[in-house]
């Protein structure tokens, strides 16, 4: 569960290291975001010569949460850290590589690019 002020790791090579959630998109007064939800983030830490810099406000999709996701068979997939992939205005990933595993819940029409770039799909 990601809410406002939550700090997330960045799971791509866009140049950002950590981001902070400033808004959960998708409805007024929506409080929490889970895996596959789009949030508005600000870059808190970035590497030199990256595609984004500190202070940039971009969209991101949540790919890993400590809360995890419950499957239809009753199993739960949890991760050690919260992580997101940064998106441009067309909802496409800014980076060209994805680090770490992602879940099968991202397998929708708009996030197939992330699924194909990910090294492991759980």
From Swiss-Prot:
Purpose of the protein: Binds to 23S rRNA. Forms part of two intersubunit bridges in the 70S ribosome.
Assembly mode: Part of the 50S ribosomal subunit. Forms a cluster with proteins L3 and L19. In the 70S ribosome, L14 and L19 interact and together make contacts with the 16S rRNA in bridges B5 and B8.
Phylogenetic lineage: Bacteria, Pseudomonadati, Pseudomonadota, Gammaproteobacteria, Alteromonadales
Any one biological process term the GO annotation gives: translation
Family: Belongs to the universal ribosomal protein uL14 family.
Protein name from the UniProt record: Large ribosomal subunit protein uL14
Domain of life: Bacteria
Protein keywords: Ribonucleoprotein, Ribosomal protein, RNA-binding, rRNA-binding
Matching SUPFAM superfamilies: Ribosomal protein L14 (SSF50193)
GO cellular component: cytosolic large ribosomal subunit
Family annotation (Pfam families): Ribosomal_L14
SMART domains assigned: Ribosomal_L14 (SM01374)
InterPro entries per the UniProt record, alphabetical: Ribosomal_uL14, Ribosomal_uL14_bac-type, Ribosomal_uL14_CS, Ribosomal_uL14_sf
Sample GO molecular function, one term: structural constituent of ribosome
